[in-house]
Amino acid sequence: MTTPGKENFRLKSYKNKSLNPDEMRRRREEEGLQLRKQKREEQLFKRRNVATAEEETEEEVMSDGGFHEAQINNMEMAPGGVITSDMIEMIFSNSPEQQLSATQKFRKLLSKEPNPPIDEVISTPGVVARFVEFLKRKENCTLQFESAWVLTNIASGNSLQTRIVIQAGAVPIFIELLSSEFEDVQEQAVWALGNIAGDSTMCRDYVLDCNILPPLLQLFSKQNRLTMTRNAVWALSNLCRGKSPPPEFAKVSPCLNVLSWLLFVSDTDVLADACWALSYLSDGPNDKIQAVIDAGVCRRLVELLMHNDYKVVSPALRAVGNIVTGDDVQTQVILNCSALQSLLHLLSSPKESIKKEACWTISNITAGNRAQIQTVIDANIFPALISILQTAEFRTRKEAAWAITNATSGGSAEQIKYLVELGCIKPLCDLLTVMDSKIVQVALNGLENILRLGEQEAKRNGTGINPYCALIEEAYGLDKIEFLQSHENQEIYQKAFDLIEHYFGTEDEDSSIAPQVDLSQQQYIFQQCEAPMEGFQL
């Protein structure tokens, strides 16, 4: 989104009227967003708490009231499952010792199995409600902790399983437990709430409506063990996550101050989740972007682009990329933090998704004003972009094409000539054969901007010859543009027709240039016709 003033300025100053400013500054494209829409490996939205072997051994030695886990197998099973009738009897007994022992058995079942029997647990009448009841036992913090662990692992399951925990009334009690005097109980409550918030936007909003944020943020005000901080910032990121719809900004924006100092924690997991939270908060209208900027996080986010762990770099880059979708002033804040050198470094990343996001970020900078385009030129970024345009994976080439076309749309004559001298014409022509209609349009728009400049030069120097027509012909661009006159997309064939008519005259179409289709590469193949070796006969 752009401010009205900026939009009017762009519509007047950009040579290319077919790409409007909102198109040029792209928050997210609707198609082809594998990276942005897939579940990231770097960040789990739900986590199951699994005891270590050491913890299990310690518990078995210290627990004198219950059976060892191995003995569960020898006990009488309830019909059809792993839950024993003794476990059910014990959990509903009035003995605190038996309640604790049975709860631990349930917890072990839900922690150690590759496929924990969550459905069996939640279908056992009254069991989930009983665990929620145990959460209220302030006089027995161990029972609170074990019950919270059981419910955490139930909530780590699917949406239906998570909903059972919510319907049992666990969320308000978990939020109360964030203020428990026992750190184990606090941490397990954070974990459970993170799982519930991570299930869906509906669950996230319910947890926010239960007023989780004040006690959750209060946790960060004291010295915590590292696992507590990790769980708390992960839960915080889940509360900020989601786009359909996003969380109510007023309910999550109070966490910005905490996130700003979490960016200086050395732990990689904490840094990654803090950056993810900021990337979610900055993904939206300019007022949200401004709130993130006002939190003072931009310089640190740019510094984290050079972190040695991709788990941190990916969300930091996403947050920086979101901020530069704002207006020119907001984009300038990132540029003033020396972001371009870091982005140039990321363009040579061996990780394709990082290269792609860096190109996307740069494309939103080149959608800015001419001074901002010049900073990209001065940072020597365009040679790398043109190389990517020729050699990278297609999804990355698409983002590089946007970056170059945006620069031809808003750039000065000198800036466009610089891009031509770097060799941008041939890779733009190569994109005219791809199956992706949007990128064909982007390439056509870039070439049109270049041709328009050439026409102005021809008039100015009096030659009447557009110097860029020949360069496009040499790159077999004219053949491809002619073929696009029969494209199924109306905007593409109209644009191709207009370019041929306006810049290349009305030559007869040569049927020999009709291309074959290479479906494996998602593009058309043109034969490159060459003059005979002996030359033309006079």
Swiss-Prot record:
Pfam families: Arm, Arm_3, IBB. GO terms for molecular function: nuclear import signal receptor activity; nuclear localization sequence binding. The keyword Phosphoprotein applies. Residues 1-36 are annotated as: Disordered. Residues 318-406 are annotated as: NLS binding site (minor). Widely expressed. The modification Phosphoserine is found at S63. Residues 20-36 have a biased composition (Basic and acidic residues). It is found in: Cytoplasm; Nucleus. ARM repeats lie at residues 77-117, 118-161, 162-206, 207-245, 246-290, 291-330, 331-372, 373-412, 413-457, 460-504. The modification N-acetylthreonine is found at T2. Belongs to the importin alpha family. Heterodimer; with KPNB1. Interacts with ANP32E. Interacts with ZIC3. Interacts with NSMF; the interaction occurs in a calcium-independent manner after synaptic NMDA receptor stimulation and is required for nuclear import of NSMF but is competed by CABP1. Interacts with APEX1. Interacts with RAG1. Interacts with CTNNBL1 (via its N-terminal). Interacts with AICDA (via its NLS). Interacts with SNAI1 (via zinc fingers). Interacts with DCAF8. Interacts with ITSN1 isoform 2. Interacts with TALDO1 isoform 1. Functions in nuclear protein import as an adapter protein for nuclear receptor KPNB1. Binds specifically and directly to substrates containing either a simple or bipartite NLS motif. Docking of the importin/substrate complex to the nuclear pore complex (NPC) is mediated by KPNB1 through binding to nucleoporin FxFG repeats and the complex is subsequently translocated through the pore by an energy requiring, Ran-dependent mechanism. This is Importin subunit alpha-5. It comes from Bos taurus (Bovine). The gene is KPNA1.
